[in-house]
Amino acid sequence: MRNNNCNWLIFLLAFILSLTTAYTPDISVVKNNSPAREIKYFDDSSTLLVLRDDHLLISKNDGKSFEEISDIKDPIIYFEMDPTNKNRAFAMTLSQKQYITEDQGNRWRTFEIDLFNGEMASIPKITFNFENPNYLMISNYECPEGQRLNRNCKHRYFYTKDGFKSKPTKLSVDAHVCRFAKSTKTSKIGNSETVFCTVNQLNSYGHIVESHLYNSNDFFQTKNEIKIKPLDSSSGEIIDIKIEEDFMIVVSRMDKFNEKSLINAYVSRDGENFVRADLDIDIKYGVMSFLPSSVSSLFLTIMDYNSRAFQTASFYGSDSSGLHFTKLLDNVAGGNIQKIENIDGAWIANIGVDSNNPYDGDKSLLDNLFGGTYAKDIVSKVSINDGKDWSLIKLNDNSCKIEDDCSLHLWDFTELDGEGKFVTGPTPGILLGVGNKGKNLAHKFDKMKTYVSRDGGVTWDKALDFPAVFAFGDQGNVILAVPYNGKKKYDAAKHFYFSLDQGKSWDKVDLKHPIYPLSILTTIDGTSRKFIIGGIDDSRKSENEYIYSVDFTNAFDGKTCGDDDFEEFVARKSNIDDEPLCIYGHREKFRRRKQDAQCFVNKLFEDVKVIEDPCQCTEHDFECGPGFKLSEKDSANVCVPDRKQLSRLCQSKSELSLPNKVLVEGNKCNMGDKKLEDFVSQETLKCSDYVDGDNGDKQNPNQGDSNQIEVHINDFEGKLAQYQYIAESQDKNAADNIVIKTMDDRVWISNNGGVSFVRVPISDKILGFYAGPIPGQVILITATNLIYVSDDGGATFIKRRIPTQPSPRVDRAIAFHNEKVERFIWFGEECESNGRCTSNAYITDDAGATFNKLMANVKTCDYVGAVLESGDDELIYCSAQNSLDNNKLALFSLKESSSEEPKKVFENIVGYAIAGTYVVVATIDDKKDSLLSKVTVDGDVFADADFPHDLKVEPHQAFTVLDSSSKAIFMHVTTNEKPNFEYGQLLKSNSNGTYFVLALDNVNRNTVGYVDFDKIDGLEGTIIANVVANAQANEGTKNLQTLISHNDGSEWDKLVPPTVDSEGKKYQCTGQPLNKCALHLHGFTERADYRDTFSSGSATGFLIGVGNVGEFLTPMDDSSTATFLSTDGGVTWKEIKKGVYMWEYGDQGTILVLVNAVEETDVLYYSLDEGQTWKEYGFTDYKIKAHDLATVPTDTARKFIIFAQNSKDHRDIQTYTIDFTNIYPRQCQLNLDDPEHDDYEYWSPVHPIGGDKCMFGHESKYLRRANGHTDCFIGSAPLSDGYKLEKNCSCTRRDYECDYNYVRDVNDNTCKLVKGMTSADRKTTMCSKENAFQYFESTGYRKIPLSTCKGGQQFDNWNPKPCPGKEKIFNEYYGREVKGHKLFFLIFIPLIIFLGTVLFVYDRGIRRNGGFKRLGQIRLNDDDDDFNPIENDQIDVVVNKIVKGGVYTVAVLIATVKTIRKIDRMMLEKLGNVIFRRSPGRRNYVSVPNDFDEEEELFGDYQDNLDDELEDAVFNQDDNLVRTPFVDDIEETETEAQQGEQSNPRDERLFDIDDNEEEEQQQEVSKPAPS
């Protein structure tokens, strides 16, 4: 027992002794009042620089102490280490004086540069030269005053040839981007003086006209332009130059007018010959980033910013030519992919995958970084063959096996190196990472641990039980880690941990001052054993920073390892067979310290050395040669001819002999007993098999190269139920997201225009989706109590809980706010226990996170305040039941944030409609049993919308609000409701929606209520409608005819048919009048998709339709049916195809596509020359039945989607995305400063009657691609900037339409009162309205709201008259009633002022100068020398001048009165009566008598002195009445003038004396009545 006690005592003493002798590194700490902005090491040095509070400090002892640099006297905004010279660094200021050191910070000198002024917009950037470090460029952006960094800013470059020893010189070119050819160590391009620059030429509009690439060997004293084919200087925009390894990449934006355009990359190895890479990447929403590359391959990521919540990237790698790229990995979460240092081909990446169990808790740090709450999980994978294969990361833990769906997932696996970059560490395969084991990365940071790998990331072990930031020293033999907790509230680190055995064991060391770690670093090459830990203290009251210097130099007594302490480490060993994998034809070996060896490598500033071991050549060491590509069908390394490449290589050649494979550039494999022929075969190719036949046809150059058309096929389970394009921004070209719902209740999303689709990972049954008016807004409706909300076009969805299930009694589930994405109204159903259900409205202002009940028993609600021009933004209208026992609907208004009860606006309504900035309410007048229309423009005041007198709308009659885009409301009122024979009247309102007139009768509609009415996009006032020609029959089959209006519904004509069909044959009815032979088109009511319109808003003047030529419209299946095209707004037409075709416009009309809509097909037809010629293109190997053809709603894209029935399974659908993006070799040149030399021309719509270009009172000019310029695309060119309003035209009959209660007589084109109504009826109707005090005498015409005509013929003279008994209000309104204070101000105030002035003048100027007696002695013709008034000051001088002027004036007046007495008094009376007897709203003209008294000789012949316009005029007393002469530009209107009063032609000239005054009075008429 005693012996046992002794043993325990010995053991305890030994343990205590071991604790007291445990190694602790040397630690020192420096306290600072604020944290450092930047901290960096000089390479191969113990010296580092720190930027803190605009002061630059230096430490020469690995951070143990710091001192300010005395040579620097100015505030420093940033500093930069020179990668070409490890002794040099630069410190930049906000002045012309900058600082440079060339001895690692010991001494600093200044250099001056004209770089900074008030317009500089960015931090200056230095461009380095690896061959001659003294050659440097420095640049900054200079922007127009008050503007941020944008396209209008100029990039200013300065250069030095002596390392800034002399003042830098400005480059002589205004470059956009400049790069040295020797921007990398391995570049073989050019020489040390070679500089590449891009230069953009702008016009006065700020548009890029040309983009050039130049090089120079003398800093642009001379320059040479580099021509890149097919990149023309006028096409696209060069946005960047990259030098990566020995590759030079020129990155260009395909559409220079769109910053989110597709990009192209042109690659060169000599800087002279460039070839376009097949990098067909849509980076419309993202950024291209180049990753560490090699001489054998370029690597890059494309960050996809399509999702604002969860950003992913795609990872691409090229072949050794840099021309052919392969997507190696998709959905890289946050772009988090990292190459393992020192090991070729090794990468670790985090991948975003759809989560089946979305996290609904509070956001953690990871949630903010990676969007953890957005139904995405993160899975980590590793590749050891340059991304060709990826596998889950193996954890050496028996409880976590990959086959059990468990692996290691890493949040971070990088350290901050001495240069300030994040790297995996300069070690021989030793890595550290923070993460967790399981199916995916944890969403909470505190669940993560720290793991270590010793085989380059293939397998891992747990190192620490908490997450940590870390750094490596002595090639990984010293590891320092500081705990870092990612909770919202977390404790500061009180310890740090270190390992001296490559992460196998760890020791803990206390920190004197706990910190939140900000940085931990060591020397750049990771060979030092000294570390720096920087962080802020845990006090919330201050931001003190502590910098710890930790020194492990004395560990193991500083022993240096011997040969026996090293082992051979072979990289890239496979998990399967433990054999090393060959990459680039070699294996990699490292000589590293054994894990348990107690010594250090101790080779300070010596990088890790790689031992290369060549491998036997295999198929993997070869790649496809020029003209070939990897086969998509074969899994092996099989290369097949590439039609795209060969079409370029075969130019002017008939045959090619090419090797199908080549050895990868830089590959080090050993051929051994193999021969080159064992891997490569020489192929002979006939160019005729690969070159488009039409491509070389000089007679038909208009169809592009069909080899550039790409087809992408996607298969879906279930039939198509719903699809919609979703815009991502206000940019008209950004609607590339497509949402598809199938009949099996699944939803698929594409964010690349239909090239690929991803299924939304929602297990709930999806009933449908709604797309809001705000870009990106999509909401999925499910059969559960959940909805899924997206604001990024469906890239991510947030799960929200709804208060109730959607109501089947409401025709929609959601009403959106027009401007605020977080607001919408939910319509749900709430049922009681007795089964009685009500439809309720619920409102949210936080995108569905919470809901509040808005109103019960609703039929629908809308945010009307957001659409009305002058309405309250929070105003909401709801139509709801008056009571549960009453089925009548009432209209209620309420405020979103108000607690007040809803206000009842109308007691009994049918419904309401929002039309542009109007709200139209259909109310029921119970007394008259009729339907009334009420209109509001502010949501508060409603006005009666009066229908024509002869149209009584019954409560059961349907009316449809069609359009309001032309400052008037178009409405269709059904007048015949007999099934299958429905039609009605097309009504049009005045500008405020209160008076409706008949625009067209017998307009066709269908049973559902849709109307054959199409407003043509892009053309003012052009409308196409179908009418029922046999309306009187009232039964049977409708005979439809198509009419077109070019003046907003005022006049209608039939469509003029083409003379011959598409086969050059005449039509049977050719030669007959239009009423027997016209073009008729199938309209809105017959479309499968109502979004398929005749026209396109971007393809101005283009219309396509299906129809026939004849007397009436024939059925679709009739043999006469064909497809027709118009390019001049419907004036002329041509037949383009026999049969029924679906059509779409692309690229603003430069691409037209047709697909057979009836028969199965495997081809489409396209035209690139505005429909002049058409080409057939086979898009599938078998025939399919096309259901729809679609593109973005703006018709500006070059991608089209065909929705088709799956040929193998008719229950499923397929999409064929036809991509014409590359069919044009260039972008059309737009130069508004020199329009004669670009690719556009002006086009004006021409009125079919008269042939003039005046439409709505003005001549407009629109830009279109010029005829014959069919080799270019438009893209986002701002053609609207070139729009010209050439002139305002004189008014003609075409600028007027019939006034309220007037109707157009088609026989003579005049407006007549509706049947059964007289002028007296009009007075009665208008005066019977509530609060009415005036009515108007109408001429029968009113100006079309769109018209801007001036002068010319005036048809619309409005004359206000008082309603009976309302004369007083009328006079007050027009300012004729003077009383009260008005009378005081108008009479007494001026009288008082006048009397005071007279008294003052009398006292100072008359009385003291002798009174009136003295003034009477003044003679007009005598000098005033005898009159010397008193003038003591300046006031006396002024007064005396007034007196003298008054004397002269009185004298003249007396003489004038005496003369006028001789004129006949009767004539004066008549003149006075006419002059002063003016009516409001009437023109001011003069009535002249025809007789004179005997004293007329006093003035000679009176008539001789009149204006020539009044010569020989004959007037009488009745001339005072206003008469409106109608002189039409069309002969038919003469009839109307004959039916009215006979007016003397000479009166017509007098009628136009004072047009401006009449316009002012008409404005007065439109003012509201006084209350």
Curated annotation (Swiss-Prot):
InterPro entries: Sortilin_C, Sortilin_N, VPS10, VPS10-sortilin, WD40/YVTN_repeat-like_dom_sf. Coiled coil: none annotated. Residues 23-1382 are lumenal. BNR repeats lie at residues 451-461, 497-507, 788-797, 842-852, 1124-1134, 1165-1175. The keyword Membrane applies. It is a single-pass type I membrane protein. It is found in: Golgi apparatus, trans-Golgi network membrane; Prevacuolar compartment membrane. Disulfide bonds: none annotated. Pfam families: Sortilin-Vps10, Sortilin_C. The chain crosses the membrane at residues 1383-1403. Residues 1553-1562 have a biased composition (Acidic residues). This is Vacuolar protein sorting/targeting protein 10. It comes from Candida dubliniensis (strain CD36 / ATCC MYA-646 / CBS 7987 / NCPF 3949 / NRRL Y-17841).
